[in-house]
From Swiss-Prot:
It is found in: Cytoplasm. Gene3D superfamilies: Urease, gamma-like subunit. This is Urease subunit gamma. Pathway: Nitrogen metabolism; urea degradation; CO(2) and NH(3) from urea (urease route): step 1/1. Signal peptide: none annotated. It comes from Rhizobium meliloti (strain 1021).
Length: 100
């Protein structure tokens, strides 16, 4: 299987998001990379499902709460920018203050 660097990045993010979901199910608080991966995966999959950029910008800010991440993580992440593939092309989605 020959994957492009972009495809490899998508798979890595997807796998990290799976790990993050399993940890949340066990009640483990997420660290910085896990939180980023989970929100990024949410946006990428939402784009594939046909949701709008505006909808994902809003919904992406409700994927995680402060109680689900380690202390100080919410303050470290101000914006997450995701280049996602929508039915009408690739667009940049910015989620502002993603952990509230």
């Amino acid at each position: 299987m020959n994957l492009t660097p972009r495809e490899k990045d998508k798979l890595l993010i997807s796998m990290a998001a799976m790990v993050a979901r399993r940890r949340l199910e066990r009640g483990v608080k997420l660290n910085h990379p896990e939180a980023i991966a989970l929100i990024t995966d949410f946006v990428v999959e939402g784009a594939r499902d046909g949701r709008s950029v505006a909808e994902l910008m809003e919904a992406g800010a409700h994927v995680l709460t402060r109680d689900q991440v380690m202390e100080g993580i919410a303050e470290m992440i101000h914006d997450i920018q995701v280049e996602a593939t929508f039915p009408d092309g690739t667009k940049l989605v910015t989620v502002h203050e993603p952990i509230r």
